[in-house]
Regions:
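Short cysteine clusters
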Residues: 27-33, 37, 96-102, 106, ...
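Iron-sulfur-cluster electron-transfer modules
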Residues: 15-21, 54, 58-291, 461-470
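Iron-sulfur (Fe-S) cluster-binding segments and ferredoxin-like electron-carrier domains
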Residues: 35-63, 104-123, 379-393, 421-432
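C-terminal amphipathic alpha-helical segment
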Residues: 301-352
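N-terminal cysteine/histidine-rich coordination modules
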Residues: 1-29, 38-75
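Cofactor-cradling patches in redox/metallo enzymes
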Residues: 109, 193-291, 337-354, 360-470
């Protein structure tokens, strides 16, 4: 009865989500989005145009839920739900990374990512999904993070990173875990804790917080900021996101600080307050170091690490030596969700320009809100579709290759854990001499800490600072 299951699920979601119902009806097929999708640009497949990808779903909608479709059938652009249609859904809705670049150019503001979310949710009802989405989601349900790491192991890994990083400045770092009464709960994607190169970003957080004396704690239960429910099911997204609020309430913190992640921030900025809020038990975030009130986080009670760090720099609370990053020629990749779903555009650039002397922008067309996707977001970072991923990443790779050749760029910075995982494959294929790094990693490189050892000659990756190797 798979057809019945999908049809019933379709009806329920049309009734529940007003935006989905609206998006099914208002598209005029103008084609403004057609050449904005990286997968269409590189494949030339018309069904990878956002408008025609959505038509795969709309055609069934017309057939089952509109009078014109029921009467006129194919003359109204309607078609029945068959197994071939389901196969098309699987093929094309898993070639959408939910990056929302097409939505920027849509004159009606249609969010094609939400159409993809609904299509995947319908497929999931009949057991059609991919392991790279389901496995992390199941792990997060079971242990609180995508990798399925138990609380005691999470704590041990952080302590190991502390041991590794303490030798660089020569200063003891003192993170706390599950500490009740801390002012701030810090939550970051598990990729920053367990995956290279994300671990260097985690080291950067630890050094930064120690330097400013931040009263924060980590949770071994809400040990994941990312949310694979966004790629799979609204109910699962709500469930996974709830753990952050529940843990913040249990620990009695004032507000939440979030690390460098992508889809984590779309969920927080666009869905969190209505899904799991209001978080009346938390306070409107105020920096304990500068006194700045983060008014944009008034409802969610959660602040992005780039906003927090940019505010520290603006108020002269960090002593920085940008020359410590002179061995890096840096460009910046605007991660889709922080950029388009949250508007974090200038803060990372402001931070980078204050901690690096050599920063070069990619061409204007594929950056900021027009940024091209890494090619493997929304759970598509899986080996068996590597050929599709590399094609999808070509527009971003082309811009990267341009600045690499023009400015000898050797570092691609980003503020997304999935980017730090997916861009490794991209750079290895398209730009082998370029490393991928988090912005907070470079902040820690430049950070002049109180009481640090007299000669600090290596960065977080144990690479010598420029001139030291001589």
């Amino acid at each position: 009865n798979w057809q019945e299951i999908i049809s019933k699920g379709f009806r329920e979601r049309l009734d529940k989500f007003q935006s989905f119902s609206l998006f099914m009806d208002i598209c005029v097929r103008c084609g403004a989005c057609a050449d904005k999708c990286h997968f269409f640009l590189v494949s030339g497949d018309p069904k990878n145009m956002p408008v025609l990808r959505a038509e795969l779903l709309r055609s069934v909608y017309r057939n089952d839920f509109t009078l014109a479709g029921k009467l006129l059938k194919k003359f109204a652009g309607a078609r029945p739900l068959t197994m071939d249609v389901v196969k098309e859904w699987f093929l094309y809705f898993f070639q959408c990374t939910e990056c929302r670049r097409c939505s920027v150019f849509c004159p009606y503001g249609i969010d094609t990512a939400e159409i993809t979310m609904m299509a995947r949710e319908l497929l999931n009802l009949v057991g059609i999904n991919i392991n790279w989405i389901m496995d992390p989601a199941a792990n997060c349900t079971r242990t609180g993070n995508h990798l399925g790491i138990e609380p005691h192991t999470f704590k041990k890994v952080i302590e190991t990173l502390v041991e590794d990083v303490e030798d660089i400045p020569g200063i003891a770092l003192n993170p706390s875990f599950n500490r009740k009464g801390a002012e701030i709960l810090f939550i970051t994607p598990s990729g920053d804790v367990f995956a290279d190169p994300g671990v260097y970003t985690m080291m950067g957080y630890l050094m930064l917080f120690e330097h400013i004396g931040l009263d924060y704690t980590l949770s071994t239960y809400a040990s994941e900021g990312g949310n694979f429910g966004l790629f799979n099911s609204n109910e699962l997204m709500k469930k996974l996101n709830a753990k952050m609020y529940h843990e913040a309430e249990r620990l009695g913190v004032k507000w939440i600080l979030g690390g460098e992640c992508g889809h984590m921030w779309r969920v927080i900025n666009q869905y969190m307050d209505t899904m799991n809020g209001p978080a009346d038990f938390l306070e409107e975030p105020v920096s304990p170091i500068t006194g700045t009130k983060f008014e944009n986080a008034k409802s969610t009670k959660m602040v992005h690490i780039m906003e927090f760090t940019a505010d520290l720099i603006k108020n002269n609370k960090l002593k920085l030596d940008p020359s410590r990053n002179d061995h890096l020629n840096v460009t910046f990749h605007d991660s889709c969700n922080p950029a388009r779903a949250m508007g974090i555009l200038e803060e990372p650039r402001y931070v980078i320009q204050n901690v690096c002397n050599n920063f070069y922008e990619m061409p204007e067309e594929p950056i900021r809100e027009n940024t091209f996707c890494c090619g493997a977001g929304s759970g598509l970072n899986t080996e068996e579709i590597m050929d599709i991923r590399m094609r999808g990443a070509l527009p971003r790779a082309s811009a990267l290759k341009y600045v690499e050749e023009k400015h000898d760029v050797n570092t691609l910075a980003c503020v997304c854990a999935i980017d730090r995982a997916t861009l490794l494959a991209l750079t290895q294929y398209w730009a082998p001499d370029v490393e991928v790094a988090g912005v907070t990693e470079m902040v820690a490189n430049a950070l002049v800490m109180d009481g640090e050892k007299e000669v600090r000659d290596h960065d977080l990756r144990d690479e010598p600072y420029l001139g030291v190797e001589d």
